[in-house]
Amino acid sequence: MLFDKVKAFVVEIDGARTGTEPVFHGGQAVAGRVLLELAGAARVGALRLRARGRARAHWTESRSAGSSTAYTQSYSERVEVVNHRATLLAPDSGDIATLPAGRHEFPFSFQLPISLVTSFEGKHGSVRYSIKATLHRPWVPARCARKVFTVIEPVDINTPALLEPQAGAREKVARSWYCTRGLVSLSAKIDRKGYTPGEVIPIFAEIDNGSTRAVQPRAALVQTQTFMARGARKQKRAVVASVDGEPVGPNRRALWPGRALRIPPVGPSILQCRVLSVDYSLKVFVDIPGSSKLLLELPLVIGTVPLHPLGSRSASVGSRASFLQDWGLCTMMDRPEAPPEYSEVVRESQLVCASPGPSSLLHDLGVTTEGPYFACLQEFRYCPPPLYSEEDPNPPSEAVRPRCMTC
């Protein structure tokens, strides 16, 4: 406006770096200030602040009501997870206060709820957090300033359920033009259910090809976004990482002694939201010429708190060693790497969409290719875990020492 005396009106949050969104988790205190700079004395009615966090899902579907009639069905659902209001400036007497020219600061602080939902952006839904300041003045439209912040809820993979090995087995009779070509079987296992971005998933698999044609084993990390509204569901799947094995010839058997699949910088699993969820799974499958693929799916949870360096990690390595012993692969086991911190993997420079994976792999898994492959989140500044060490300060006695921990 030509005679507007407001030179600057912004919301600042403590701890935020220039050009980045501040990051919090449930239970933390959010503090900052509203900055108001006036070119001259101005009359102000009130300055109000509102912090909001919303999870929403929305999509439309085309429906047919006959041969010549069509309509669009809309589905929407919204959940408010944060709603904080505060008045930062209210005149003591009367309805109007006069502020002199210059810079004015109005501090604020509030506590986030203990349990929140991780920030998320998807095609059919989102989880967003923001702080909005509104300046009310007489005879002038209200002026607003907004600041967005990110929430990442801790997902600790050091729980017994997420440290359990995941395994499965499937078999299929290969057929072509009503002719039986033999039995193809697949068994696979990973040493635990929970991982963090940047870690490598060692895939142990056995492919037994009893058919008369060569088959192609593959594995893929798949993200599934599920949106829920008015009793309906909408899903979006994307391949975020994949690895191919060597073809297995007719009547041959092949082993994967820990085929490595590295997890890219993806957002963590979202499991406790009423309107949307983000799940991950490892799909190990075999392409059989002339027949449908043989598919085995193992559930995964992508967390933010990495594996502890000693206790739970020893259990994970032990389960992996036990699996290798069962398959006679103990000599092939590599020394495990220390898991990276979440903030080392998911950084600002990686806030771009991943490049599309192989189109044939997407088609095989029934995954659509439109839209971003995954939503990366900004750097999450947890306190760093203890330094990683391969040596246990309290080693077990020789009588109970595992036979194959670091073969």
Swiss-Prot record:
Disulfides per UniProt: none
Q: Which GO terms describe its cellular component?
A: cytoplasmic vesicle; plasma membrane
SUPFAM superfamilies in the cross-refs: E set domains
Relate the assembly described in the record. Answer: Interacts with WWP1 (via WW domains).
Family statement:
Belongs to the arrestin family.
Protein name from the UniProt record = Arrestin domain-containing protein 2
**In which organism is this protein found?**
Mus musculus (Mouse)
